[in-house]
Amino acid sequence: MSYHEIGQLTGADNETVERYIYLLEQGFVIFRLPSLSRNARNEIKRSRKIYFWDNGIRNALIGRFNPIALRDDTGALWENFLVTERMKINHYYLRYRNYMFWRTHSQQEIDFIEDYDGRLHAFEFKWNPKKKANLPSVFSEAYPGSEIRLISRENYQEFIM
């Protein structure tokens, strides 16, 4: 969601939305994840994803506390959980990484990327382990030597440890 879209929903101008996002970030309520772009024409360059450090705050703000099986935002909730827990455990163990996501103008996406040891380590998150993951070959072609892993309910524990 862009600042413009948030502004339209809330009735605030872009500058006010940016300032509020900044304040929420400074208060450790949310954080922004930048997009990866190394000059490929089809990559989105200045986009950011916004995550909540605590899914409970996210749920409170949108007023949804239904069981996971009854929710229509399971994918977003799962992604938010995995990204934040991975960043927390990396910080705890002093594993320094640069974090980002990747998206093209044609909406191909990698949910989460860590850049360390001179390589990109990409992760695609799926709540349903039986659902087919579309891992974009465009990413592998643009970033040879990168690793792409699918993270689901079956293997997430090793990801957040």
PLM segments and residue spans:
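Accessory nucleic acid-recognition modules appended to NTPase machines
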Residues: 1-119
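Structural motif
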Residues: 119-121, 147
